[in-house]
Amino acid sequence: MLVMAGLGLYDERDVTLKTLDFAKKVDKIYAEFYTAILTGTTMEKIEGTLQKPITVLDREKVEYETNKLIDEAKDKDIMFLTAGDPMVATTHVDIAVEARKKGIEVVIINAPSIYSAIGITGLQLYKFGKTTSIVFPEPNYFPETPYDVIKDNLKLGYHTLCLLDIQADKERFMTANEGLDALLKIEEKRKENVISEETEVAVVARAGSINPGLYYGKIKDLLNYDFKSPLHCVIIPGKLHFMEEDALKYLFENI
């Protein structure tokens, strides 16, 4: 049996009772934290909560040695843990599908993810369009996909959730400041008037924690603002309903 369980967003207290129950029964627990990470806790605390040791797998082992994990689940009960919800990342979906192809029982335990946590903004979830990711620019690598996604969503009046790059192995987490700066750099190159320093955006910091940060304002006023510890994400609002306008006014710190 393969149990795919999410750990939630912030700390070990996000672990569900269902996950705790299955953790007691399984033979071995694996986890990956390269797609996302819980910044409010430590591996020791997670292991203490589950009362079992956890073997952490790096990107290469998850993406290129998936069969080893799946084959082990033929004869043993294996738990695979991820931050957020276990079925958000395409890689995790592939693991579940391949396991089922081999006749292995798959149990999926859902958990809070950024897609549920953005409800804290008061923006209507059904008005979000395609999600995009802003990555750290590298030499000869500066994808403009986020710009195109935002442009297409705005045409339809949709909000855009921009996830920010995580390089957990380097303990490097893109800040909202860096994400906004990247969007302005793409605009400077494309000149299609999708984003400007006058564009009003929302920033969510430490979603899922007891004290998340909610900030709203023009990009020019947010570029040098201290959003404090990660993880951050950026939302480019589309057409706003009056209730959403009230949410941005009263639920957010307006910069």
Curated annotation (Swiss-Prot):
This chain belongs to which protein, by name? Diphthine synthase
Reported function = S-adenosyl-L-methionine-dependent methyltransferase that catalyzes the trimethylation of the amino group of the modified target histidine residue in translation elongation factor 2 (EF-2), to form an intermediate called diphthine. The three successive methylation reactions represent the second step of diphthamide biosynthesis.
| Catalytic reaction annotation | 2-[(3S)-amino-3-carboxypropyl]-L-histidyl-[translation elongation factor 2] + 3 S-adenosyl-L-methionine = diphthine-[translation elongation factor 2] + 3 S-adenosyl-L-homocysteine + 3 H(+)
Disulphide-bridged cysteine pairs: none
Under the heading SUPFAM superfamilies, the entry gives: Tetrapyrrole methylase
Gene name?
dphB
Family named by the database record? Belongs to the diphthine synthase family.
- Transmembrane as a keyword of this entry, yes or no, is no
Q: GO annotations under biological process? A: methylation; protein histidyl modification to diphthamide
Identify the residues that bind S-adenosyl-L-methionine.
L9, D85, V88, S113, I114, L164, A207, H232
- Pathway assignment: Protein modification; peptidyl-diphthamide biosynthesis
Q: Which NCBIfam families match?
A: dph5
